[in-house]
Amino acid sequence: MRRTFLLLAVLAAGPVQAQDDFDSWLGAFRQDARAQGISPATLDAALSGVVPNERVIELDRRQPEFLQTFSNYLERRVTPAQVARGQAQLEQHAALLDAVEQKYGIPKTVLVAFWGLETRYGAVLGSLNVPTSLATLAWDGRRSGFFRSQLLDALRIIDAGHVSATDMNGSWAGAMGNMQFMPSTFRAYAVDGDGDGRIDVWQSLPDALYSAANYLQQAGWHANEPVAIEVRLPEGFDWRQARVAHRLPVADWKALGVQAADADALPEVAGRAAVVLPQGWQGPAFMVFDNFDVVMKWNRSQNYALAVALLSHQLAGGHALAAREGEAEALSVEQLKALQQALNEMGIDAGTPDGLLGPRTQTAIRVYQALHQLPVDGYPAPSVLAHVEQAHAAAAAAGKLTLAPAPTFAEPSGLP
């Protein structure tokens, strides 16, 4: 944090001072990179004359005003147009996708779903120079260690002859190509799909698709098993059981009355499954499987993993989301901070009021819901905020606000 404040002070002081600070950092970095085997030619091509990109810093620090509901997330990513474009790609690249699926066991609809979500099937690869972006972020200091490592890997990719420094473009964070691989992911999993002796995840679709399939296989993909399916929950369902950490055999969920939303039988899988409620108990419900965890290794967002499942399902001709969306409004970041603060003051540990919906805050919401006989889904719905505000006001009026620990949340039976 101190480094971030210093950076802001430097930028505010003017471009000359900022450039001097950056040049000093860059000189030391070049020496380290050279000591690690990066060639002088690559260092010159990638870093000579480079200046910090203030737009990259702005994007790195950008904070949304509101949380995003699951339905909002899907509305932007799994649309009829996106499905239609994906089905056209399935037809156009059928032979290539068949070959990739045969080698790696990753369904073609899943690969195309990743492709659509990452870059709209190659339409939006990112136009920022990756070495410049990574150098800016490594100098910035907020996550300097991570981005310094990514910059070194980007230089190694250039050094290996896979792409020139000027053609290595991507997102502001350094994600590259059709599947938006970070440099470290490229070096660990990218493969030469077209056999031309170099790996070009930007212009060679075989390289991009083979690389993505290799990643998913190495991440532990389970053949012939879904990522997630929409389900219908029975009347009287114990909402405490709807959490990704609560895994049961599919047969046990069936015995509890859980059914597939499309009336098909629940899939038979070797592992265990969980039920998740991305928009609370009033919204859609999903059963997630081991491949959900694989997708979460690619992107740690549960909404993203569910979007992969839904888009791939629709690409294969399946139905769109069947259930209602739940409470449509999302809390603002400031409202979530207020919710966290109120829970803390009532003795329920929600962590630092930061406006971020992490596991600690979700558990705190569950504790509150259990104490007040509300559906225990851990979701920060506007109705939950209103209930907490009312209870907080009553506790304050009675002089009962406290920071003492609240009763422990009662886990459902059968939790591993």
Predicted regions and their residues:
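N-terminal signal peptide c-region/cleavage motif recognized by signal peptidases
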Residues: 13-15
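Cleaved targeting-peptide boundary
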Residues: 18-26
